[in-house]
Structure formats: C-alpha cells, structure tokens
Amino acid sequence: MIELGVFLATPNLSDAEKQRISSWVDALSNHDTLHGPNEHYVAISYHISLFISRRCGNDRLFEMIRSMSRQTLRYSHLALRDTVRRDTSRKLWKNLSDFLAVRDAANASKIARELVDASGKSARMYLASSNQT
C-alpha cells in the first residue's frame, strides 16, 4: 500500500517538499539518531512516510496507509532497534529521497516497498528469536 502512495505522491511533491524530505532523511544520519535509542529514528521515519503518503492525492488511500502505519508502529520499533538495521534503513531512505528529487515514481515506490519488507523481516526475526529463549 505504501508503495502505491509513494508512486502517486511523487509527481505531486513540490521542490520545497522534496527539500524537506531530504532534510529529514539527512536527520536520520545524525549520530545520535542512528546510534542512540531507536525512538527518534522511528519517529522521523514514520513522519517522512506519512508526509509523502499525504501527497498521494487520494484521501482514502492516505487514511488506509496512516491506519496501517499506526498499527505496525510497534513492529517498526522492534525492526529498527539495531543500529546496523537503522543504517540499512537510512540508506534506503536516502535512495528514496534521491528518486523523489528526480520524480522517478517507479523506483521511489520500489524503495518504499523495500523499506516495508526489510522492517517486516527484521521484526519477524526478532520475534522468532525471542520466542526461542
């Protein structure tokens, strides 16, 4: 769902909005954000995701994305608890921002899907390992 939101939002983003997204993505690289507790990193990622999705031009789709994002926020915290995983996420966000900058909706939406898939996989691995102890 998020990839559709990103795909539809890409042509709607103004230069100023793309710059704001880029600055938030840069904030993900901040040492304290990347290597400290994951709450700040997750909050920025969540904000970027909803900011982009809001520009999709479809209020119903945005509401579905927002609802799904709220429901999976706990799993995002689990998935991004590790600094190595946050660094991988940061690189994907940087790629997504770069594709948004040149209005490449296909690749931006592909990266959005990778972000969701990677977080889901990481959360599932964490939950599986915590159930074995």
Language model: regions and residue ranges:
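A glycine- and Lys/Arg-enriched "phosphate-lid" helix/loop adjacent to the NTP-binding pocket
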Residues: 82
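Short, charge-rich amphipathic alpha-helical segments embedded
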Residues: 115-132
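Active-site loop of classical SDR/Rossmann-like NAD(P)-dependent oxidoreductases
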Residues: 85-87
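Conserved segment of winged-helix/HTH DNA-binding domains
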Residues: 1-17
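Short alpha-helical functional segments enriched in proximate histidine and acidic residues
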Residues: 4, 8, 51, 122
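Conserved amphipathic alpha-helical segments that form helical-bundle/coiled-coil interaction surfaces
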Residues: 14-78, 89-97, 102, 107-118
